[in-house]
Amino acid sequence: MKNFIEAQIKSSIEAKEKILKDGQYIEQIQSIVEIVIQAYKLGKKVLLCGNGGSAADSQHIAAEFVSKFRLDRKALPAIALTVNTSVLTSIGNDYSYKNIFERQVEAFGKEGDVLIGISTSGNSENITLAFKKAKEIGITTIGFLGKDGGENKNYCDFPLIVPSEDTPRVQEAHIMIGHIVCDIVEKELFGEKVDE
């Protein structure tokens, strides 16, 4: 058991080291931060969606924006499209599960907002449809993806693809990236500027 635990920890570290050592990922995270900051400066909001563990990540990241990450500051508008069971089950029943996020993007999204779709496989049809609807409205789309980015990468403006085939490692990297984004956005808007 000890060896298995150590192997899992090493695997998690390796996935994050790949991100750390490849300047492309750092630049992508910087771009995402800049997009979110610009949206907030313009009085816009962030929408987030995902399935399963990625739904939980959507809620987690939204909570960091609305409540706080580190600083006591003004709340930032962020909505996880994964939390209203009446809306989710109504859309799933009246339309289809694939439409659960698309309909909410149509209802809540406004031009200039940001949509972060999270999918470890990159092949979540409901994320693809949400991205398509967002583009119709004029919402900037960001994908936190895994594996090879799947279909989702073709429908978002900024696909960030974690370099791993292992779902748990992808999820761990997604929440790490989400935390980095929240941390820098908060500091840039309300605290000390982050050094280049």
UniProtKB/Swiss-Prot annotation:
InterPro entries: GmhA/DiaA (IPR035461), Phosphoheptose_Isoase (IPR004515), SIS_dom (IPR001347), SIS_dom_sf (IPR046348), SIS_GmhA/DiaA_subfam (IPR050099). Keywords: Capsule biogenesis/degradation, Carbohydrate metabolism, Cytoplasm, Isomerase, Metal-binding, Zinc. PANTHER family: DNAA INITIATOR-ASSOCIATING PROTEIN DIAA (PTHR30390:SF6), SEDOHEPTULOSE 7-PHOSPHATE ISOMERASE / DNAA INITIATOR-ASSOCIATING FACTOR FOR REPLICATION INITIATION (PTHR30390). Substrate binds at N51, G52, G53, E64, N93, D94, S119, T120, S121, S124, Q171. GO terms for molecular function: carbohydrate derivative binding; D-sedoheptulose 7-phosphate isomerase activity; zinc ion binding. GO terms for biological process: carbohydrate metabolic process; D-glycero-D-manno-heptose 7-phosphate biosynthetic process. Binds 1 zinc ion per subunit. Its cofactor is Zn(2+). The gene is gmhA. This is Phosphoheptose isomerase. The keyword Isomerase applies. Its EC number is 5.3.1.28. Zn(2+) binds at H60, E64, Q171, H179. It catalyses: 2 D-sedoheptulose 7-phosphate = D-glycero-alpha-D-manno-heptose 7-phosphate + D-glycero-beta-D-manno-heptose 7-phosphate. It is an enzyme of class 5 (isomerase). Catalyzes the isomerization of sedoheptulose 7-phosphate in D-glycero-D-manno-heptose 7-phosphate.
